Amino acid sequence: EPDFIAAWYSTFSDKRLGDVDFWHERSVGTYMALNSGCRGGSGTYQQTVADECQDILTLGMIFDVQDRAEALVAEIQGELDNISPYLADKDRLTVAVLEDEGGTYRVYGEDTLGGNVATSGGAELAVGKHGDNGNISAEDLIAANPDAIFMVWYNGYTVNDTDYAGEQVVELITENPAFASLDAVKNDRVFAINLNNVYCSGMRTLDGVLDFAQHLYPEL
């Protein structure tokens, strides 16, 4: 018997918690994360770090902890303000943010939060530009040849029934002979990143930005 539910748009589907009206009729408040699809897919609305900050501020108002919410958003903005001048006179490293779906690779492109977190952390996207967030093949990845690859994982993540939840997700790239020629492989720039840091990341948004910034520019 909750008083309030904060969740993704998909959480309020018929197969899960049901429509928000069901809860409102029972005096239960609800909030959907802006980047979870409640306004439409990433192809309709660009998902941004700014949206995550707005979620934090809105929830801060709902729970009457505005000062804490504002401090967290200020911390995120402060780190972004540190990263931008550092990169002003540098060529950004090209990056692919991918999720292995067993033969093809989901792209976290520029319209997705993952893509926006990556660029906020100093990446230049090698794939997923101009709203093209469709899956890519191994051949597409080889042709793009990014400087670095970030492989997305989450708890329970498997590929072909093998557990790749955690740092071992990089092996999907580094242990695949087809990718031996990739600059990211040759230069040890294949990294793991948790889905929580690149999708509806909320309070973990800064973790995501720093994941990219610190891996790509360790001297930062």
Region spans (language model):
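Acidic/histidine-enriched, beta-strand-rich ligand/metal-binding domains
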Residues: 125-132, 140, 144, 148-149, ...
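Short acidic/glycine-rich loop or secondary-structure boundary segments that cap or lie
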Residues: 103-107, 116, 158-160
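Short, conserved, surface-exposed binding loops centered on an aromatic residue
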Residues: 85-90, 117, 140-144
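Alpha-helical, coiled-coil/dimerization segments enriched in small aliphatic residues
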Residues: 107-134
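Acidic/His-rich segments in extracytoplasmic proteins that coordinate ligands and/or metal ions
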Residues: 1-62, 137-178, 214
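Internal, well-ordered alpha-helical scaffold/interface segments
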Residues: 57, 74, 112-119, 139
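Extracytoplasmic substrate-binding proteins
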Residues: 19-102, 127-128, 185-220
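Residue-level recognition of alpha-helix initiation/capping sites
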Residues: 13-15, 50, 109, 132, ...
